[in-house]
Structures are given as structure tokens and as C-alpha cells.
Amino acid sequence: MSLQAPKGTKDLLPTESYKWQYLENKFRNIAADFGCREIRTPVFEYTELFQRGVGETTDVVQKEMYTFEDKAGRSITLKPEGTSPAVRAFVEGRLFNETQPTKMYYFTPVMRYENVQKGRLRQHHQFGIEIFGAKDASVDAEVISIPVGIYKELGVEGVELNINSIGCPKCRKTYNEALKKYLSKNYDKLCSTCKTRFDKNPLRILDCKVDTCKEIVKDAPIILDYICDECKDHFEALKSYLDVLDIKYKVDPFIVRGLDYYSKTVFEFIIDDITICAGGRYDYLIEEIGGPSMPAVGFGMGIERLLLTLQEKAIEIPEEAYVDLYLGNMGDKAKLEVLKLAKELRDRHIKCEIDHMGKSVKAQMKYANRIGAKYSMVLGEEELNTGKVSLKRMEDGQQIEVDIKEIDTLIKVFK
């Protein structure tokens, strides 16, 4: 039996990688437009980071993390999300001493042991943006505007933005008491996990995926009725900023997100009942991880889910030709000249491919066509004697005669 990739993982083959490169380049440019710079963090972290950051009672920590002991007996976890590592790097690098805000973006693989289904893998990839040091709701609106702009630029229609406020620790305490009072009436019907959450973190019950629990929380108290004046003012300001930016949204009082570090603003972008991007504010996470008290907000966008959405919407990602010129050859002497010519062209950043297989001219041209080369030329004895060669544009078959030695003239064709 041949070896296969582990369940829930997928190879990115050359025939598909151009789509990822296209999105990554677009995301980098958009992030730069907002003043964000890239951060890269390790693929694994100490488990304590996610226990403290994501939360002990979350599904991520309790059920989904890939955790193991290294040879020194330290508990290590493969990264299940991107925000906590970014915050850890921010604190460890003492970036809080720099002029704020600090704006970061990242591309990262994340690993979660989940049921494998359409658009959900055990290793998937996220594009994320995190902004540290700014507490005004205008930053929340700016962060939300980034995915809005991405979907618009890609031509993705039908995306819904849902927003909510889950308050701060002070007002959430009051809400938790009301929620527990409501849930106590149906305590026996809660799943075993939610019974544990009842005392430790009842808010997590609102995020439970078990059908009986989902049914119970349908009539639960709404958190927006319990948030303090400061959180209420922040949420009203956010809505005003979104209105100014002409960003359509719906208030969904049951969005709580599956990670404990969120406070105040939370949001989700949904298409066809699937969340394709989510985020919010996490004003207490930096301090929890060992830094100073400092506000922060960000989001994570699943790249595989975005690609699946583009496919379902029949939105094609343009594939650029990865070969500018195919250099065919006939005979050993011609092959030597082709090798030298290819080197000169590659030194000038012209993408070239040559025949190493000894194919016939007909087979070489078929290959040039199959790989999508923009141009082709074939050097043989006659071309070497005259110093002239026909340069063929593969798109329409148009040919022009060029001097083999006139590299600058040849370069102009590709610029």
C-alpha cells in the first residue's frame, strides 16, 4: 500500500498553487494599504499559551488541539489558531514599547482535530490581521472593512456580516448570572461538556454544537441587554462607523465566538450558512499572556474555505503563464547554445524552459503549448549558421525573426 497524506490534510500541487499565490499577493497588498506588516510565528507553541489565551473550557482546547510532550517533557501544541501566537510574539518582542498602534498580518497553517467535511480540514490555512494598541471602535470598523474589500475585489456576492458585543468582564459577570439562572431550568438536558461549562464559563454553552444544547439556548437571555454603558457606547459607535463606510450588517445577539479571549466586538462573515471569516476585539489577552494592559482587535480568514466559495460561485482565479519562452533545440551543438541563451535570459528575469529529453521538434512544440508558454523558438543547425531564429507567439501563431545575439532586442518582446 502506498503512503498517503494524513486524514484531514491536503497537498498543494503545482496545478493549484497559482491560486494560493494570487490570493496571498492580493492579501499582502491590501494589508499594506492599511499599514500592516507581516509576522511569522512557530508552527508549535507551549500548550499553556492556548490554555490561557483560547480558554480551558473551549472546544478548541478540550477537544481539538494536537498536543504532545517533547523529549524534555514539555507540553507542546500545534498551532490551532493565529491570534494567541501573534500576541505572544508581540509581548516577547516587547513591541508594546514601540509607538502604537502595531499592525500585523500573517499567513499560517492551523491544526485542529475536527470531523473532516467539505471546506473543513484538520490542517487548514488562515490569513489574519491583528491591530494592537487602539481601543476606539473606528479600528474595529476598519478591521471589518478589510474582508469586505477582499470579497468585493474578488467578486464574491451574497456575503453577510453579523456583529455583536459580548461586553467586558464586568458586565459579562452580570449576564453570566442571568444565563445560569435560565439554564438551570434545563440543566439535566445539557450535554456533559456544557454541564462542566455551567459553573466555569456558561457563555461557552451558547457556542455548543450539540442539538439539545442549541435548542435550549434559543430562548436564552440576550447579552446586549446586560452590557454596561461603556460597552454599549462602543457598540453604538461601531455601528455608526460601519454606516459611514456603507458596510451592511446584521446584529446577531447570539454570536459569542468559540474562543475565550474576545471582548466587546465580535463578528462573522457568512455565506450559504458557512462562516468564512471571523474576528473581534480582545482587550485583555495581551495582559493575560504577560504584557501590559492594551486593547487589540483582529480577524482570521480561512483560505481553503475562500477557495471553495470561489469555486462554488464559478469565480476563476487568473493563471499567469509561468513560462515566458520555450527554447527548443535540435542537436548537441544547438543545445549548448540554448543553455547559454537561457542563462542570459534568466539573468534578466525572463522565465525560460528548455528541452532536456531529446524530444522531436513536434513533441517540443506540443509540450510548449501544454505548459502555456507565451513564446517559443527552436534552434537547429540552420539557425546557428544564420544567427537568426523565428520567435513564435503561441497565442496566435504569429512569428517574427530575431537575431540570436541581440539579447536586448529579444528582452523587449517580453517587457
Curated annotation (Swiss-Prot):
One of its GO terms (cellular component) is cytoplasm. It catalyses: tRNA(His) + L-histidine + ATP = L-histidyl-tRNA(His) + AMP + diphosphate + H(+). Gene3D superfamilies: Anticodon-binding domain, Bira Bifunctional Protein, Domain 2. This is Histidine--tRNA ligase. It holds the Pfam family HGTP_anticodon. Its main location: cytoplasm. One of its GO terms (biological process) is histidyl-tRNA aminoacylation. Belongs to the class-II aminoacyl-tRNA synthetase family.
